[in-house]
Amino acid sequence: MDKDRPMVPYIIVELKKPKLSDGKEQLKSYCNATGAPIGVWTNGEQISFYNRKDPNYFEPITNIPKVSEKLSDIINEKFTYEDLKKIDRISQQKRSLRSLIQEMEDEVLASAGVDSFEEIFKLIFAKLYDELICERDSSAYLKFRNSGETDFELKEKIQGLFDDAKKKWEGIFTDESKILLSPSHLAVCVATLQDIKLFNNNLDVVDDAFEYLMSKAQKGEKGQYFTPRYVIDMCVKMMNPSINDKIIDTACGSSGFTVHSIFKVWKDIRREKGLPEGEGFTAAQRIPEETNFVRDNVFAIDFDEKTVRVARTLNLIAGDGQTNVLHLNTLDFSRWNEITKQEDWNDTYNEGFKKLKKLQPKGSNDYSQFQFDLVMANPPFAGDIKENTIISRYELGKNSAGKWQNKVGRDILFIERNLNFLKPGGRMAIVLPQGRFNNSSDKAIREYIAGRCRILAVVGLHRNVFKPHTGTKTSVLFVQKWDDELCPKKEDYPIFFATMQKPSKDNSGDKIYLVDPETGLPALDKHNHLIVDHDLFQLSYMKQDGTENLLEPGIAEAFAEFANKEGLSFFR
């Protein structure tokens, strides 16, 4: 109760509703009816704290005031990056960035008259910069938070932060780009985001949010969805990239395959130098060998401009300022010269494109062939290619009679295109619809693949992996191009087959999380985050006593054993 008004509630706690959206509405009604300035929602697993600013908006706060504190002390408190780590709503309250964005949409964005994707992207961009600066200067205070300013003062501060971020990471937003949210709407969004830590070891925090934003726009129309990070990690473990590998993702989405390849190689570099392993997606400064690898060896391409900007952001930050993510149509390479001559395109992408051109074979300059060691991709598999100018560039564009077809599945052309990106002995991991592996009509495709490379493995993914976007059954194909030294041609050889047994998501597309069998509570990783339950590779979680508990080896570990037994070149 309010100490100055003993009969008036000071804090109301809502315990009943299992979903935050339902419970928050109930909480609002109670607070509005009683005038209580603080509301708390919890379902026993998650908890959220709110300050009732007016009947229509409840501002998230970090906690309820202690007996010696006022509400204003909580609202106006200054925070360092270390303070943020302690109150992070994602690890402490088990919230997701996606759910917080949905909350912002309900509160203000739906009626703000702005492009939600662009405005949230700007805020995430500015907040990532703020976290980077404050992690590297432990005495600095975070600016991305409402510390008692007026709404207009707050907007001026956040716009300045965004402008500084644009200078640090060029080519994502134009110099003229401004935050378009009104001061009052921006204040709501800042309050919602200020107590979460975006820098996260596995990128899930940011990735999940961008997938949600883009799935509402054009992504689903072409059958292209961000690949879950646990599928990416399995592919990286099985393809085992090394510091000398040239790596590309030809349909990069948010660039998970390349970023996680970077993390894996960085671990190898640090282990070889006797340095602490470090984390993946952090603001920590990188040693020269790490940034040189990103600058010279890692590339990504996508046809969607928004997707490319997301991918470039994550690559720039993960790579400490380095990125070779390019906005191009991978399949339509005959038009690359025309596109790359455009001034605006050149300003952003020219440095990366010059490096890509150097990876063509000697004497080749039409972008049809490259010399990469590793291609990993999840190409769009909905919609056919119908342009004759594209189809005529591919052998798989012909039918069984050797004549060009009027339309060809997009993923089919990606198979051939990806193989043409590889040098002899190069390897590929590609996500494909299950039908390509067993449809009688696709026999010619399978024969084409077998003629050009050794089929290393096929891993069947669970039907729920790409839900809620699609329930299409998919598998990952792993191959290595024939080469006299790295992969001598054989007529008969063993192939590794495996099928994912744990679905990782339920039928609605919600992630299924690992449970600690000793406590019956959700298992957490060393960052206090929930762990998706799957069997693609070996999982571990932190026990109550602070020790790490390793679970059974998964598919990736079984393949590594197979690869060593077979003497595959990239596991020697």
Show where each model-derived region lies.
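Short amphipathic alpha-helical segments and their helix-coil junctions
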Residues: Q92-A112, V188-A191
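Long recognition/docking surfaces used for binding and targeting
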Residues: I120-F121, F125-K216
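A short, conserved, highly charged catalytic patch centered on acidic carboxylates
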Residues: M1-I38, Q46-L84
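A conserved structural/catalytic subdomain of Rossmann-like adenosyl-cofactor enzymes
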Residues: S68-I74, F333, I339-R572
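Class I SAM-dependent transferase core
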Residues: M104, V205-Y230, V236-M239
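Short glycine-/polar-rich loops that comprise or flank the Walker A/P-loop
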Residues: V8-Y10, T34-I38, G44-E45, V294-D296, ...
